[in-house]
């Protein structure tokens, strides 16, 4: 049974959300690398010391913002997967990649916060919410490869040589694969994500602004298809 919050608890939760929203707004104006309590307090009509009643320090606020961003990205990608035929692995890859790119273009500051330039001086807590949120968001990609393996349609990747270190890392850090995804395919999955992330960054940060929208879209889909074929994902 859900316990109702007291009035004070509701007010505190609302203020926490307002602080985070103001911080996101400032990041949209001045970037993600210079988040300061003084600026947030000024926007909210508060004194900087008052913010410490809600967040222990700037890093605690950044941790919440990063975790929120990963969760939002994960939800967007998961929703895209759910709208596809679960047996159409190629279609799922295009849908996942497109959702990833669309979110990055729409939320470029949040994208930069979690997958762009590190914020100077910030170190994520070792076992904090950012690690779990990031893992959950990126699990959408590994689930796609696991599904392909379950269906028996995961093909050998273009590059099949994999180091012992990479194979050990796959087994240790991603036990959810349960041996279904061989090391060479795990490596190909990381390479496919790197390709998706690379072209998304170029697009989100204006490097393709000289292209028409149609040309950008065609290039993006073509790149996803190329990376799928290299990774052993069946695609039409």
Give each language-model segment a name.
Residues 18, 26, 30-60, 64:
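Helix-turn-helix
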């Amino acid at each position: 049974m859900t316990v109702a919050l007291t009035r004070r608890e509701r007010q505190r939760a609302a203020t926490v959300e307002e602080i985070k929203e103001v911080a996101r707004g400032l990041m949209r104006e001045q970037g993600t690398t210079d988040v300061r309590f003084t600026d947030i307090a000024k926007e909210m009509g508060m004194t900087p010391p008052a913010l410490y009643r809600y967040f222990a320090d700037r890093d605690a606020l950044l941790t919440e913002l990063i975790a929120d961003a990963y969760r939002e990205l994960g939800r967007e990608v998961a929703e895209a997967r759910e709208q596809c035929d679960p047996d159409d692995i190629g279609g799922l890859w295009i849908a996942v990649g497109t959702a990833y790119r669309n979110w990055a273009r729409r939320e470029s500051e949040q994208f930069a916060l979690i997958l762009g330039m590190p914020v100077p001086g910030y170190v994520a807590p070792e076992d904090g919410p950012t690690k779990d949120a990031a893992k959950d968001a990126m699990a959408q990609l590994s689930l796609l490869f696991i599904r392909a393996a379950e269906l028996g349609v995961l093909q050998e990747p273009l590059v099949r040589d994999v180091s012992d270190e990479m194979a050990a890392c796959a087994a240790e850090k991603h036990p959810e694969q349960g041996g279904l995804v061989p090391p060479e395919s795990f490596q190909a999955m990381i390479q496919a994500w790197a390709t998706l992330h690379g072209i998304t960054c170029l697009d989100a940060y204006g490097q393709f602004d000289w292209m028409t929208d149609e040309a950008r879209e065609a290039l993006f889909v073509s790149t996803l298809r190329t990376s799928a074929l290299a990774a052993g994902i069946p695609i039409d």
